[in-house]
Every structure is written in C-alpha cells, then in structure tokens.
Amino acid sequence: MPKILYVEDNEDNIYMLKRRLTKKGFEVLIAENGKIGVELALAEKPDLILMDLSLPIMDGWEATRLIKTDARTQSIPIIVLSANAMEEHKQSALAAGADDYDTKPVDLKRLLDKMNRFL
C-alpha cells in the first residue's frame, strides 16, 4: 500500500481527498502545515507527497525546498495541489523543487495518473 503524505490545511479538502485516496488503496498521512509536513516527510518517508502552497506556519514553497534539499527526503516526489492555475505560479512551485503541479478542485483521475507516474 503506497504511503502518501498530504500537506493541506483546509479540512474539507483533507476529508474529501483522504477518503477518495484511501478507497483507492493508499495510506494517507495528514500534515496541516508545512512545518509538520517536513517533519513527517523525514519521519515517515512517504512514497509521494501532495503539497498545498498556501499553508500556515511554513508555506508549501519553503516546505518543498526543505524536503528537496535534504538527502534523506530529496528523492520523494512532490505534486503541488493549488487553486491557482496561473503558469507563473506553477513555474515557481517547480522551481522550488516540486515534481509536478495540479489544480484544485482535484480531478481524481488526472491526479491518480500523475501519482502513478511516480509510484
């Protein structure tokens, strides 16, 4: 069962995506801010990270940079999930180290296709 770390602070988004991914056979860990996301990435070594960008305490850009510059976690794929569909927003997430980018609301089939490329 692939282990997914979902870094998201919106309870509705957490509930919906965690439920849908669990039904598809994934183990889903939740971090409600970027700081906890970095800590869980180090402690749990998930197979993939889904990262929101607008997070409290530490935003998703900084969390992505920290995860991707640490030798213990740099190989973990990160897919950013953001409500912002502007190209420059996507490019800034990729520049921070994200491996892919998808928009909210989440299209589950599209997201699963992206996830399966890394798993």
Stretches found by the model and what they are:
Residues I14, P56, Q74, M86, ...:
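The feature encodes the CheY-like receiver
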